[in-house]
């Protein structure tokens, strides 16, 4: 994806991207630049890799395996194509963050001080094809303060889903 300080990829979004699909693309651009050690990546004259995000990357495997779950996502890296899609716009963000985690990015607490991004210089991906479904419908922290930084941190860590009110929610979980 990145070599010699240049981006070797082109991001493809649907013609009318959802705000979350656009956010997923923006976050991918931002963190690929950070991984490469630059503030902004110039595009190479030739961009051989296509990164399809959201509805631009939807496929039948994702629809079949994750039809009922709004948090499932699909990552496929094959030849010169990377496909990142979710069963919802939020799940599309989960796909991007999962890919970034594979590259070493971590978000330990809200805000820039809580992120850890290795400087790789060169960013390469291994062939991959998988569907991820959360083990729990509800992945929340009730003590997490509300606010833009906390909300973004929660999204980056794939928190969300159904909220189970109260401390005794076992009956709703099973």
What residue ranges belong to the model's regions?
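Feature activates predominantly on carbohydrate-active enzymes
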Residues: 24-27, 31, 66-174
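Acidic, contiguous N-terminal accessory segments
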Residues: 1-74, 118-131
